[in-house]
A protein has these predicted regions:
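Domain-level signal for soluble alpha/beta catalytic cores
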Residues: 1-343
Length: 343
């Protein structure tokens, strides 16, 4: 499975749910045909990766490997770095994360090292046989099998435990690679999970070292008559400016709440997610008293979000915890149970 070639909204016209349906149709056919696992590869968009993983997980529980391609600046076409992609996709349920096609093997070492800092799942690397060159109208790859295999050893040392070859590689490349790495120790993923939120382009780690972390809570219509009026008109100009102002003033995370009368709260929440994620790089905190609105927001959010909040009341936990798990979200837990406030 790979990219569709279409641009997702709001950059293009393809809606997220339509893309999930495309991948789901493919996943159903492949799973029914007897596939052992899914490989989602040569991906340039983290959001398209999310759509593919969600689609597969809604069809079956077969293993999923997801591999992105990165530009020379270390980011995808849409600005995602390897660490952010790793955090998002492993929290969403991918079984392996990696890089393929982008470059030759030498240039994959640094991205693999960055993934290894965060990966709790195996890392895969499938480089090209060097960068493509055009000779007499024919595309050629000039990295020979021995050089390819030598760099493959460095990829294993960097943290890759699943390796192979992409464009320009031949059976000789793979044979040499196997011989070079067959006796090397297999890299083990991290066992300690870290508290990390992300947007599509940035990650924020929540540490317990006493450092103060600012969550901006201005995007909330409660007590803001001008914002309420704008939202009823369908305008998000104030929301956009609030997001920019809070990021500029040092907010690490932005809380988004659309709870008010006179609007379709779910539709406005979704529109706000699109607007804010297109405007700033801060991860978002989804704030609503309605379970369906929280789920709708998490489904289209192109990162790993925070839920504000989940109380310890059984009914609410039974509804929200499976949603948080499905979309890989973190949550604020309120110590309020069916027995009331703790003493």
């Amino acid at each position: 499975m790979t990219m569709t070639g279409q641009q997702l909204y709001p950059i293009g016209d393809l809606m997220f749910e339509d893309l999930v349906d495309v991948y789901k149709e493919q996943a159903e056919v492949v799973a029914d045909a007897g596939a052992d696992l899914f490989v989602v590869e040569t991906m340039m968009s983290l959001q398209e990766c999310r759509a593919a993983v969600i689609a597969i997980r809604e069809v079956c529980d077969l293993p999923i490997m997801v591999s992105l391609t990165y530009n020379p600046d270390g980011r995808t076409l849409y600005g995602t770095d390897p660490a952010t992609a790793t955090v998002v996709l492993q929290s969403l349920g991918a079984d392996a994360i990696g890089i393929n096609c982008s470059t030759g093997p030498e240039d994959m070492i640094e991205p693999v090292e960055k993934m290894a800092e965060y990966a709790t799942i195996p890392i895969l690397a499938k480089p090209n046989a060097g960068l493509p060159e055009l000779e007499n109208g024919v595309t050629v790859y000039k990295t020979g099998s021995e050089e390819f295999a030598s760099c493959g050893k460095k990829l294993v040392e960097a943290g890759a435990s699943i390796i192979g070859g992409c464009c320009g590689t031949t059976p000789e490349h793979i044979r040499a690679l196997k011989e070079a790495v067959k006796d090397m120790p297999v890299h083990k993923p991290l066992t300690q999970k870290r508290r990390i939120l992300t947007s599509e382009r940035k990650l924020v780690e929540i540490t317990l070292d006493g450092n103060f972390m600012v969550i901006g809570e201005r995007i909330n219509p409660t007590g803001k008559k001008k914002l309420q009026a704008e939202l009823r008109e369908g305008s998000l100009n104030m929301v956009r400016q609030m997001a920019l102002d809070q990021e500029e003033n040092g907010a690490a995370i932005l809380d988004v709440n659309m709870g008010m009368n006179g609007i379709d709260e779910k539709e406005m929440m979704i529109n706000t997610i699109y607007e804010v994620t297109s405007t700033v790089d801060c991860p978002l905190c989804i704030d609503s008293s309605h379970v369906d609105i929280i789920e709708a927001a998490l489904r289209i959010y192109p990162g790993r979000a925070l839920i504000n909040s989940i109380s310890m009341e059984k009914e609410k936990m039974d509804k929200l915890l499976p949603i948080a798990e499905k979309y890989g979200a973190m949550f604020i837990l309120l110590p309020l149970s069916d027995a009331g406030l703790p003493k």
